[in-house]
């Protein structure tokens, strides 16, 4: 009798359509074009302040910022620096709606650059900033009100060419990360400024081949810096050709932890990190290129992760969104792009994929993914001719 009951139970499980149903694939919706804001050679990126879009970059070798509305109508335009050459390369918006922009300018005339006293960590094969900006040795921060008024400009002179890559802000100030060139190659750096824009001590990360691509400011005063490295960092050796790195820096500016993400005979880079430690990056092994999207805990333990065929660089926003240029099918999506196509994915708190939306073909790179209270979720892309902003909200 027990055997018959067991067989009956097993049979009911085997033939239950609900128990054995394959998970439903996610449909991919179209992203809607909001507006285009300039050309790729003049636009570094876009952030949102209230209902305005803040476009920043360099035009005619001069750093600038300007605001447009969702139709592309210009609201204000501000030249940030009067030097012969200057660049604006990263931006963030604080809770008041003020815009903090990071870039680089030449050293003040007659100023002797200080000898850096870095906190060495070791680097990755970062490209040295090009010779055309060879005299840009001052890390520069600009703060602008939402109405386009320049509140302050401050600089941190260094002894090498610098290329800021990201900035994070909170009520206590700002943190800028980037790449600095030297005779060995390149290193990453972290520069912090207080709420008045006054810089503190520069922290150098590595010495010959490291990048610092994104930064998170934590409430305890510590920092998380992510990027890549192909050298030993704080005793942690390289496992692949280049590893993605997650670096903990204390309030006292000491490197306290390094976590490496590697691929055998491959290259990994963490391109972005949200404040919730949702990281986006690229994985390159031979001719295979993928986007990696991983949610980490506060101790840098991965809680969930995905890989998708792509052109590489991946941008994250909040705890739920990631965007990249997709190049292939995924078993989770009703999706089979014939050409590289922008793709925005959304996840729930447990890491389940909950939604997807795509932009038009012809886009070469995702410059950013933004979450705006007023404008919703935005994706910034660049094509050969224009930088465009897309939204999930139909217009």
Task: Tell me the role of every PLM-derived stretch.
Residues 2-8:
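Sec-dependent signal peptide recognition
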Residues 21-395:
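A sequence-level/structural motif corresponding to short, flexible coil/turn segments enriched
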Residues 1, 15-21:
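Polar low-complexity intrinsically disordered regions
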Residues 8-16:
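Bacterial N-terminal signal peptides
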